[in-house]
From Swiss-Prot:
Expressed by the skin glands. Disulfide bonds join 63-69. InterPro entries: EF_Hand_1_Ca_BS, Frog_antimicrobial_propeptide. GO terms for cellular component: extracellular region. This is Pleurain-A3. Coiled coil: none annotated. It comes from the Eukaryota. Residues 23-43 form a propeptide. Antimicrobial peptide. Has activity against Gram-positive and -negative bacteria, and fungi. Has little hemolytic activity on red blood cells. Its main location: secreted. Belongs to the frog skin active peptide (FSAP) family. Pleurain subfamily. It comes from Nidirana pleuraden (Yunnan pond frog). Residues 1-22 form the signal peptide. It is found in: Secreted.
Length: 69
């Protein structure tokens, strides 16, 4: 009976450790997915400003070409 208790306690302990390690690894993976690097942030800002200014730029060019301003 003593060996059975000892074995069950060992299995419980090892199971708890493995679950804890899996949770830590999963949390680390989720953190990597959410955080953007500084370079990615710069790229996204440049892209957003480019997309926002491009239609306005085309309107200004068309306005000057056709003198409709």
């Amino acid at each position: 009976m003593f060996t059975l208790k000892k074995t069950l306690l060992l299995l419980f302990f090892l199971g708890t450790i493995s679950i804890s390690l899996c949770k830590q690894a999963r949390d680390a993976d989720e953190d990597d997915g959410r955080k953007m690097t500084e370079e990615e942030v710069k790229r996204s800002i440049i892209t957003m400003t480019r997309e926002a200014k491009l239609p306005q730029l085309w309107k200004q060019i068309a306005c000057r070409l056709y003198n409709t301003c």
